[in-house]
Amino acid sequence: MTNVSIHPSVDDGVARGGAEDFQGGTLECHCASDKVTVEVSAQTAHNHACGCSKCWKPDGAKFSVVAVVPRDNVKVTAHPEKLKIVDEGATIQRHACTGCGVHLYGRIENKDHAFYGLDFVHTELSKQQGWSAPGFAAFVSSIIETGTPPEQMDGIRTRLTELGLPPYDCLSPALMDALSAHVARKKGLLH
């Protein structure tokens, strides 16, 4: 086994599967008091380790762990006044706590985007067990943009593979197919 730290929630192995009847839980920021809380009332999908430079990562982690859930199942339940969008120009509008910096959820507002209607959440912010498990790693090469030396990439890809997280330098094939099919439908090439 390769000794490379990916993310605290997967470094000791990925817990497989989520509870079939799991109906969500509460995400909490890291503030000591007056926590921002977000209720997620559904099971997540497409959970993955993400190496992009935009996603929130805990201290020392090379990757975030992030999943999607229908936006209608995401509701801020405490301290919405503490949330601020990190980058107004980004496709995913990441709502972060102004107190601790944790990203509570990300939302795509562009109705023409293939993933419109899905919110991005970090289930590690929840105390509840049963969330879907990470199944792949996306935007792996992007960790170089945040300071990882390129010569470490072979070891990182090896570690991701050992953890059962196939490494991609984009999204998983199923998600890339969904994006491409969305474009083809908009062009009238698919129905």
Swiss-Prot record:
The answer to whether the entry has keyword Metal-binding is: yes
Q: Identify the Pfam families for this entry.
A: GFA
UniProt xrefs under Gene3D superfamilies: glutathione-dependent formaldehyde- activating enzyme (gfa)
Query: Where, in this chain's numbering, is Zn(2+) 1 bound?
Result: C29, C31, C97, C100
Q: Name one GO molecular function term.
A: zinc ion binding
Which reaction does this chain catalyze?
S-(hydroxymethyl)glutathione = glutathione + formaldehyde
Which ranges carry the CENP-V/GFA domain? 22-169
User: Cofactor stoichiometry and binding?
Assistant: Binds 2 Zn(2+) ions per subunit.
Q: List the disulfide bonds.
A: none
Which co-factor is required?
Answer: Zn(2+)
Protein's GO biological process: formaldehyde catabolic process
Q: Which residues bind Zn(2+) 2?
A: C50, C52, C55
User: EC number(s) of the enzyme?
Assistant: 4.4.1.22
Q: Which UniProt keywords apply?
A: Lyase, Metal-binding, Zinc
Q: Pathway of this protein?
A: One-carbon metabolism; formaldehyde degradation; formate from formaldehyde (glutathione route): step 1/3
Q: Which HAMAP family match?
A: Formald_GSH (MF_00723)
PANTHER family attached to this UniProt entry: CENP-V_GFA DOMAIN-CONTAINING PROTEIN-RELATED, GFA DOMAIN-CONTAINING PROTEIN
Give the family per the record.
Belongs to the Gfa family.
NCBIfam families annotated for this entry? Answer: formald_GSH (TIGR02820), PRK05417.1 (NF003829)
The job of this chain, per UniProt, is described as: Catalyzes the condensation of formaldehyde and glutathione to S-hydroxymethylglutathione.
- What is the name of this protein? Glutathione-dependent formaldehyde-activating enzyme
Its source organism is Xanthomonas euvesicatoria pv. vesicatoria (strain 85-10) (Xanthomonas campestris pv. vesicatoria)
